[in-house]
From Swiss-Prot:
HAMAP family: UPF0235. Disulfide bonds: none annotated. GO terms for cellular component: cytoplasm. InterPro entries: DUF167 (IPR003746), YggU-like_sf (IPR036591). It comes from Thermococcus kodakarensis (strain ATCC BAA-918 / JCM 12380 / KOD1) (Pyrococcus kodakaraensis (strain KOD1)). It holds the Pfam family DUF167. PANTHER family: UPF0235 PROTEIN C15ORF40 (PTHR13420:SF7). Belongs to the UPF0235 family. It comes from the Archaea. This is UPF0235 protein TK0768. Gene3D superfamilies: YggU-like.
Length: 94
């Protein structure tokens, strides 16, 4: 799976965010972009969607999650600390 990579710092998850959705959810894999497609209810205003992305993935994975790339873009890279690639895949259901 191209959208999940192991690094020295932790596991990198590459996502594509669709803000202002009805609810927060993982939509599946965007094959064209090679990223995990995620719907987020928060609007992309004043960092609200970014905060919601971090909160959503932190709760889902039960680990520390930070945005390391794409603060102002829909394409974001998340760094997950304290989990292996296998654990992340299992918790994401992919």
């Amino acid at each position: 799976m191209k959208f999940i990579k192991e690094t020295k710092e932790g596991v990198l998850i590459m996502i594509y965010v669709q803000p202002k959705a009805k609810k927060n959810a993982i939509e599946g894999v965007d094959g064209w972009r090679g990223r995990l497609k995620v719907r987020i209810a928060a609007p992309p205003v004043e960092g609200k969607a970014n905060k919601e992305v971090v909160k959503f993935f932190s709760k889902l994975l039960g680990a520390e999650v930070n945005i390391v790339r794409g603060e102002t873009s829909r394409e974001k890279d998340l760094l997950v600390k304290g989990l292996s690639v296998e654990e992340v895949r299992k918790k994401l259901g992919v």
